[in-house]
């Protein structure tokens, strides 16, 4: 049984994240979606909100695999958190060459610190390549329609957040 660790801020989860998660489930029997907690950052959604949105999005999009996915928080090194959760794979999504350059550096450092944990790069699908959580937050804050970029529960939460 292979466990994959999929770290990110997921603020909010996008269709791009969901695309990578579906691919990861084709490789690993269990995927841990790991929300990074950074004390110096102020996310739009709290950890509990992000975890709930991810769980609701997954129950709608992947109901048959719900038992194969866990959502956790981490505030330490990715490789240490992955090891704590019994993961042997780190999942990283790639949208373009810029992502690849950055992720290759990170993979190299992670391999030095944890040679037992492999990094798995998964390319974003064509439709999700331009999507970033930052752009989704900005568009939603300006009243734009982001329904094509995020799962339904996330869209509803963004609408509620920006009407408040």
Swiss-Prot record:
GO CC list: cytoplasm
| Catalytic activity from the UniProt record | (R)-4'-phosphopantetheine + ATP + H(+) = 3'-dephospho-CoA + diphosphate
Q: In which pathway does it act?
A: Cofactor biosynthesis; coenzyme A biosynthesis; CoA from (R)-pantothenate: step 4/5
- Name the protein family: Belongs to the bacterial CoaD family.
- Site feature location: Transition state stabilizer: 17
Write the record's keywords in alphabetical order, separated by commas. ATP-binding, Coenzyme A biosynthesis, Cytoplasm, Magnesium, Nucleotide-binding, Nucleotidyltransferase, Transferase
Q: Tell me its cofactors.
A: Mg(2+)
- Write the gene name: coaD
| Alphabetized NCBIfam families for the sequence | coaD_prev_kdtB (TIGR01510), cyt_tran_rel (TIGR00125)
Please state the protein's primary subcellular location: cytoplasm
Protein name as catalogued: Phosphopantetheine adenylyltransferase
Please tell me where ATP binds in this chain. Answer: 9-10, 17, 93-95, 103, 128-134
Under the subunit heading, UniProt states:
Homohexamer.
Which domain of life does this protein belong to? Bacteria
Instruction: Report the GO molecular function annotations.
Output: ATP binding; pantetheine-phosphate adenylyltransferase activity
Q: Name one Pfam family in it.
A: CTP_transf_like
Q: Where in the cell is it found?
A: Cytoplasm
